[in-house]
Amino acid sequence: MRVLGIETSCDETGIAIYDDKAGLLANQLYSQIKLHADYGGVVPELASRDHIRKTVPLIQAALKEANLTAKDIDAVAYTAGPGLVGALLVGATIGRSLAFAWDVPAIPVHHMEGHLLAPMLEEKTPDFPFVALLVSGGHTQLISVTGIGEYTLLGESIDDAAGEAFDKTAKLLGLDYPGGPVLSKMAQQGVEGRFVFPRPMTDRPGLDFSFSGLKTFAANTIRQNDDSEQTRADIARAFEDAVVDTLAIKCRRALEQTGFKRLVMAGGVSANRTLRAKMAMIMEQLGGEVFYARPELCTDNGAMIALAGMIRFKGGTEGPLGVTVRPRWPLAELPALADK
């Protein structure tokens, strides 16, 4: 069985084809970074228009990559939310239209469930139950996962997401959009301990996060110091260490609270090398395992949507005939699959 996956929730157009026996057959991705760089962030209208231009050509490219035709596709999965409403509507409309034209089922997929399941595209996959850290530009959440659709929110950011804090702090340091990955690269040249940032909300019980204060702390630190390359690198190092430590402390609490021995990291920030090294160390101390997707499958992509669509379709999920998207869609509202 083969599923075509369509991802258009924000500023990446991702198309992939997943086979339940052969695995990932095609993975096409177009990023709009250059389009939005001059604005310092994603412009929703521009994002939607670019998805319109790129989605169908990428579908054609994916079919060519997999050496398949439309007749070889058994279902079409598309991101139905959460995300930018205009961008979501592009992918959902094209996905639903293709499914109708090809006479195959259309499967609406939750974007964050796609991220959560992305590590299952790797050879080493997690068994249930596990704690999931979903960490990206729009979300920072800790989830208890006991099966597909069996998600319990343990904690989340009460303000900025971790990825958003990375990008905003990078902008304060004068780095180009999107600055998060550039900040992380700069942090590698920083001196540990020259600056010490707080670890927000780690001095109290609970599993919620807060990262907006780190951005303010960074702004004050930048203003009070010289603008040399080394100082900027030292500030980047201090900021990254604070975010990573905060995430690690909360993950450890979640694992101890649930008693689970497996941690799944997903979302764009999960590609961060410092975060991966920190979590690997913690899981070794706890006698557990950490799982994550390869870096290119941590950011938005069609492969995770194709896989999630495959799993949901096998569990009996099929979308309505109309086109429906949900810009806001709590993960906990997803139905559980009867067969895990």
Swiss-Prot record:
Keywords: Acyltransferase, Cytoplasm, Iron, Metal-binding, Transferase, tRNA processing. Its EC number is 2.3.1.234. One of its GO terms (biological process) is tRNA threonylcarbamoyladenosine modification. It is found in: Cytoplasm. The keyword Transcription regulation does not apply. Substrate binds at L134, V135, S136, G137, G138, D167, G180, N272. CDD domains: ASKHA_NBD_TsaD_bac. One of its GO terms (molecular function) is N(6)-L-threonylcarbamoyladenine synthase activity. One of its GO terms (cellular component) is cytoplasm. InterPro entries: ATPase_NBD, Gcp-like_dom, KAE1/TsaD, Peptidase_M22_CS, TsaD. Its cofactor is Fe(2+). Binds 1 Fe(2+) ion per subunit. It catalyses: L-threonylcarbamoyladenylate + adenosine(37) in tRNA = N(6)-L-threonylcarbamoyladenosine(37) in tRNA + AMP + H(+). Fe cation binds at H111, H115, D300. Belongs to the KAE1 / TsaD family. NCBIfam families: gcp_kae1 (TIGR00329), T6A_TsaD_YgjD (TIGR03723). PANTHER family: TRNA N6-ADENOSINE THREONYLCARBAMOYLTRANSFERASE, TRNA N6-ADENOSINE THREONYLCARBAMOYLTRANSFERASE, MITOCHONDRIAL. Required for the formation of a threonylcarbamoyl group on adenosine at position 37 (t(6)A37) in tRNAs that read codons beginning with adenine. Is involved in the transfer of the threonylcarbamoyl moiety of threonylcarbamoyl-AMP (TC-AMP) to the N6 group of A37, together with TsaE and TsaB. TsaD likely plays a direct catalytic role in this reaction. This is tRNA N6-adenosine threonylcarbamoyltransferase. It comes from Proteus mirabilis (strain HI4320). The gene is tsaD.
